Design a protein with these regions (language model features):
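Short, cysteine-centered beta-strand-loop-beta hairpins and adjacent loop/turn segments enriched
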Residues: 88-90, 97-110, 161-167, 196-203
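A short, surface-exposed beta-strand/turn
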Residues: 104-127, 182, 202-219
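Bacterial Sec-dependent N-terminal signal peptides
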Residues: 2-4, 19-46
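Edge beta-strand at a domain terminus
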Residues: 77, 135-142, 173, 206-209, ...
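Short helix-loop boundary/capping segments
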Residues: 135-200
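Amphipathic hydrophobic-ligand
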Residues: 70-77, 106-111, 168-174, 202-206, ...
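Bacterial N-terminal signal peptides that target proteins for export
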Residues: 2-15
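N-terminal cleavable signal peptides for secretion/export
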Residues: 32-89
């Protein structure tokens, strides 16, 4: 059964790092030959500077939904330019909003808002989604300066709580990445978030894919969300 109260927990992965977005590659042009196979580029891609630019400028993208539920929606992330305090020290913040209109589902619409907090270099520090989760990185996340196809790594672990008092734990998100082939001049950065409940059981895996070029421009491709444990819900958001 689709559970709207849980949805922001996993979609917010996009909020917490990189903004969000199965590589169902953008429908290629007409003609009949289908989509060409991916190419392993030999270029180096500036992942860190591309990420910083994306966070600093904000973005808004529409998407379609397939899988257990179908529909469409929008994800808007405001530029992280609001000075504030997070966990007792200076931070920059930006708000992110998800809206979804659903069919063939137990709910017809969803909407959620979260605020993500960054240091002065746009390194993510945590987030707060009222009524859902308060997340804090256990240590500063590691985002590589440059990557190549085939690279993998762990970015960080985010502790989740029910609210900012941090008195009740609500699990963890473990974030990693894989750089996948795409074209001779681009690659796909696959951000993988594994969400665990407070008992340490895996409850969902989200894969957010972005296309990156040699200049560091990041373009959302899709988000693939697979629930587990008490649900078999599978959602694919294609941007």
């Amino acid at each position: 059964m689709f559970q709207p109260a849980s949805m922001p927990r996993f979609c917010r992965l996009a909020i917490a790092l990189f903004l969000s977005l199965v590589v169902l590659t953008a429908c290629g042009g007409g003609g009949g030959g289908g989509t060409p196979p991916p190419v392993s580029s030999t270029l180096s891609f500036p992942m860190l500077s591309g990420y910083r630019a994306l966070v600093a400028n904000g973005a808004s993208h529409n998407f379609t939904i397939s899988g257990t539920c179908t529909g469409s929606g929008n994800h808007t992330v405001g530029a992280a330019n609001i000075p504030t305090t997070f966990e007792g020290s200076y931070a920059l913040s930006g708000a992110s909003t998800w809206t979804m209109n659903l069919t063939a589902c137990s709910v017809s619409s969803l909407a959620s808002t979260a605020t993500t907090y960054y240091d002065s270099n746009y390194q993510p520090r945590g987030f707060y989604s009222v009524g859902n989760n308060y997340g804090v990185y256990l240590t500063a996340p590691t985002i590589p300066a440059t990557v190549m196809v085939g690279n993998t790594g762990t970015i960080g672990t985010e502790a989740l709580y029910t609210n900012s008092s941090k008195t009740v734990g609500n699990g963890t998100n473990v974030l990693s990445y894989v750089v996948e082939p795409d074209t001779a001049n681009t690659a796909i950065i696959n951000l993988i978030s594994r969400a665990y409940n407070a008992g340490g059981t895996l409850i969902a895996t989200e894969q957010d894919r972005y296309r990156i070029d040699a200049a560091g421009n990041l373009t959302p491709v899709s988000a693939d969300i697979q629930y587990s444990y008490t649900s078999t819900t599978h959602l694919v958001l294609t941007f």
